[in-house]
């Protein structure tokens, strides 16, 4: 039940707060919600999202957590690293403040705790010595590379 509560809370935060942040930022720069919704999906986005979805369909909960973690935790890490950076152009300041915020950092802590507890519950105290842990790390690393490609779309 605890896993379901944390998962539901995280999904709620992502859909109702994080997505709205991105919609609002785009709107500030002249990109409407309609424009966003009608934009053709790029290959990098397809590769990343389908990888995560496929693991959700064919893998187990640990696989899915391993694939989702780079996104949730990566944004938090980037936000923290940029927290004290004051760009000349404030275009991304709201984004930085959101992902560096205590609220988003709490989301990251909750997700990290969910991951640790989920492995512990399913695989025991020595879960880091299991084949499943090795596989989870491979999934995490692959998802991280796909996340990097996703970010690099902006540079095209």
Model-derived features: positions:
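Hydrophobic residues within well-ordered, non-membrane alpha-helices that form the packing/core
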Residues: 26, 76, 115-119, 151
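Structural helix-adjacent loops and short alpha-helical linkers that scaffold large soluble proteins
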Residues: 1-4, 130
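Short loop-to-alpha-helix "cap/lid" segments that border enzyme active sites
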Residues: 108-123
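Active-site-proximal alpha-helical scaffolds that flank and shape metal-associated catalytic sites
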Residues: 5-107, 145
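Acidic, carboxylate-rich catalytic segments that either coordinate divalent cations
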Residues: 130, 134-156
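Short, charged/polar, low-complexity loop and linker segments
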Residues: 52-54, 121-130
